[in-house]
C-alpha cells in the first residue's frame, strides 16, 4: 500500500526557511511571527473551551427540562416543549461551531509548536536506596545478631509491644525509630505474642500480633522494591498506601491478623500441653528415683484394686489385712509387692510367726502418693 505524504507537504517546520528582504531584521521578524501564531493558538483554545462549557450548560439544561416535561401538567407541557426546542437549537449551533473549529484546525499547516504532542507524562521521585547484597549468615551468626538486637533495643521493643490504633501508631513510632523496621523486630513480637497467648493474655497477644503483621507487610514491600525496610521513603510509601487501601485489601489484612492470632493460640496450647507433660515426666522420674524398686508410686496406686486403694487412702492396716484374707492370694501378692517396690508400703521388722500379708509391726505403715 503506497504511503500518502500529502499531509506533510505543507508543514511549517521552521520560520527561518522563509525568504526575507536583506534590509529586514530576520530574527525580529521570526519572533513577531511566532508570537502572533501563539496568540492565534491561545484564541482558538479559549474558543474551544467556551464551546465545551456552553455544550455542557445546554446538556444540563436539556436534562432539567426533560424532567420537568415528564412531571408537568398538560397545560405546562407546551411551554416546556418550546424551551426544549430552543435549547436543542442552541446545542446544534454549538455543534456547528465546534465542527468549523475542527475543520479549520485540520486544514491549518503544522508548525514547530503543533507538530509534536505529549504522548505520555511521567513523574519521577528520588530513587529508593537499593538493598546491597549481603553475605548469608550462618544460623549461629544470625542467632547471635538477633540476640544482640533484642538486648540493644529492649526498651523500644517493649514500647512497640503496647502500641494501639494499628498502623497509625506504628507509623508514628517508626518515624522516630526507622531502624526498628527489622525482621528481628517481627521475631521478637512473635515470641512475646506467643508468651502472652500461653499466659492467656488475649489483649496483649492481639496488640503484638497486629504490630507483627504490619512490620511483615512493610518488610515484604521493601523486598519487592529491592530496598531496605529502614529507608524512610519506603516507610512513608508503605503507610501512604496502607491508609488509602481499598476495603477489599483491608479485609484481607484483618483476616491475616486474625489467622495469625489463631495460629498463636494453637501454638500456645501445644506449648502448654508439652510443658505439662514435661513437668509430669520430671515428677514421675523424681518419684521413681526415690522408690526402692524404681516403680512410680502414683502409677502403682492408681492401678490398685479399689478395696486396697481405700485402705491406703485411710492408712488403715487392719482393713488391709481384711482385704488380704478375702482377695485372691496371687492378685493381692502382685499388688502388694508393687506397693513395696514403689515405696507405698514401707516394710518394718515382721514377726517370724506371722504371714507376710498379715505382718503389721509398729515400724511399717502404708503411705499414699500425693
From Swiss-Prot:
Bias type Acidic residues, positions: 351-370
Compartments reported by the entry: Cytoplasm
Pfam families to which the protein is assigned, alphabetical: CDC37_C, CDC37_M, CDC37_N
Domain of life: Eukaryota
Any single GO CC term annotated in Swiss-Prot or TrEMBL for this entry: cytoplasm
Bias kind Basic and acidic residues: ranges: 1-12
Function: Co-chaperone that binds to numerous kinases and promotes their interaction with the Hsp90 complex, resulting in stabilization and promotion of their activity. Inhibits daf-21/Hsp90 ATPase activity.
The family this protein is said to belong to: Belongs to the CDC37 family.
Known partners and oligomeric status: Forms a complex with daf-21/Hsp90. Interacts with a number of kinases.
Name of this chain's protein: Probable Hsp90 co-chaperone cdc37
Organism for this UniProt entry: Caenorhabditis elegans
Amino acid at each position: 500500500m503506497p504511503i500518502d505524504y500529502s499531509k506533510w507537504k505543507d508543514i511549517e517546520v521552521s520560520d527561518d526557511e522563509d525568504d526575507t528582504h536583506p534590509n529586514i531584521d530576520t530574527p525580529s521578524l521570526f519572533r513577531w511571527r511566532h508570537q502572533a501564531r501563539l496568540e492565534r493558538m491561545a484564541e482558538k483554545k479559549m474558543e474551544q473551551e467556551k464551546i465545551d462549557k456552553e455544550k455542557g450548560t445546554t446538556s444540563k439544561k436539556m436534562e432539567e427540562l426533560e424532567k420537568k416535561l415528564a412531571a408537568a401538567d398538560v397545560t405546562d407541557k407546551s411551554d416546556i416543549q418550546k424551551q426544549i426546542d430552543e435549547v436543542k437549537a442552541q446545542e446544534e449551533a454549538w455543534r456547528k461551531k465546534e465542527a468549523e473549529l475542527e475543520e479549520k484546525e485540520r486544514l491549518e499547516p503544522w508548525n514547530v509548536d503543533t507538530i509534536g504532542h505529549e504522548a505520555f507524562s511521567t513523574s519521577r521521585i528520588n530513587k529508593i536506596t537499593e538493598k546491597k547484597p549481603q553475605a548469608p549468615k550462618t544460623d549461629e551468626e544470625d542467632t547471635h545478631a538477633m540476640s544482640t538486637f533484642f538486648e540493644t533495643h529492649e526498651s523500644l521493643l517493649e514500647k512497640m509491644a503496647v502500641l494501639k490504633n494499628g498502623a497509625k501508631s506504628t507509623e508514628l513510632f517508626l518515624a522516630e525509630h526507622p531502624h526498628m523496621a527489622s525482621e528481628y523486630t517481627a521475631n521478637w513480637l512473635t515470641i512475646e505474642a506467643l508468651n502472652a497467648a500461653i499466659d492467656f493474655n488475649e489483649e496483649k497477644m492481639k496488640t503484638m500480633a497486629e504490630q507483627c503483621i504490619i512490620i511483615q507487610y512493610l518488610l515484604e514491600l521493601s523486598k519487592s522494591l529491592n530496598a531496605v525496610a529502614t529507608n524512610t521513603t519506603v516507610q512513608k510509601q508503605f503507610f501512604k498506601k496502607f491508609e488509602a487501601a481499598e476495603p477489599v485489601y483491608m479485609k484481607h489484612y484483618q483476616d491475616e491478623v486474625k489467622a495469625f492470632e489463631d495460629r498463636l493460640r494453637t501454638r500456645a496450647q501445644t506449648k502448654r500441653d508439652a510443658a505439662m507433660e514435661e513437668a509430669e515426666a520430671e515428677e514421675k522420674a523424681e518419684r521413681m528415683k526415690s522408690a526402692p524398686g524404681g516403680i512410680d508410686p502414683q502409677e502403682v496406686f492408681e492401678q490398685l484394686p479399689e478395696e486396697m486403694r481405700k485402705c491406703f487412702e485411710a492408712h488403715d492396716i487392719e482393713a488391709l489385712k481384711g482385704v488380704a484374707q478375702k482377695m485372691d492370694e496371687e492378685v493381692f501378692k502382685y499388688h502388694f509387692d508393687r506397693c513395696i517396690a514403689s515405696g507405698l508400703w514401707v516394710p518394718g521388722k515382721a514377726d517370724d510367726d506371722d504371714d507376710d500379708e498379715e505382718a503389721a509391726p509398729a515400724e511399717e505403715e502404708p503411705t499414699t502418693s500425693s
